[in-house]
Swiss-Prot record:
InterPro entries: NqrDE/RnfAE, NqrDE/RnfAE_oxidrdctase, NqrE. The lineage of its organism: Bacteria, Pseudomonadati, Pseudomonadota, Gammaproteobacteria, Alteromonadales. The gene is nqrE. It is a multi-pass membrane protein. Pfam families: Rnf-Nqr (PF02508). It comes from Psychromonas ingrahamii (strain DSM 17664 / CCUG 51855 / 37). The chain crosses the membrane at residues 11-31, 41-61, 81-101, 114-134, 144-164, 180-200. One of its GO terms (biological process) is respiratory electron transport chain. Composed of six subunits; NqrA, NqrB, NqrC, NqrD, NqrE and NqrF. Belongs to the NqrDE/RnfAE family. This is Na(+)-translocating NADH-quinone reductase subunit E.
Amino acid sequence: MEHYISIFVRSIFMENMALAFFLGMCTFLAVSKKVKTSMGLGVAVIVVLGISVPVNQIIYFNLLAPGALAWAGFPAADLSFLGFITFIGVIAALVQILEMVLDKYFPALYQALGIYLPLITVNCAILGGVLFMVQREYNLMESLVYGVGSGVGWMLAIVLLAGIREKMKYSDVPAGLRGLGITFTTAGLMAIAFMSFSGIQL
């Protein structure tokens, strides 16, 4: 149990997708104007990462990895070259399902997210989570914990940034820094703050 807690905490703080690896910055910067919208997108990212990482773990280590098809009588088969297209296909299918669910049951959130919801398909934080799972050879349970933890970490980062940006609306920001300038500066300072977690050994 401690091992899974360690993976979960590390994926949120020490290995934060947005602030440690700078993945998913497109939606991270574009949708972080309002806390409510950021939370909605964050939940969507948690769902997609929490499902796509373990699903891709099953597919990769049982079908695509070198020697994975030994159970079918093909011990020398290596289909790992199909990894990228398979991972992206699974992610795209999950995002499409999520989009239909939001459109039907949460139309206000669906409208608020707009074009950024289908952009989760090409959000490199999602693919990054899957590729880190493959690189670290996580088992199914570790993949589930890592996927959910990475999603929670990304959501935490975007909600924090959105909260700061909402407060900055009432601040006297210098003209040259208004807009993306102050947003990049704020994100950089947040990343430096999250670096303080890197010294913690779990």
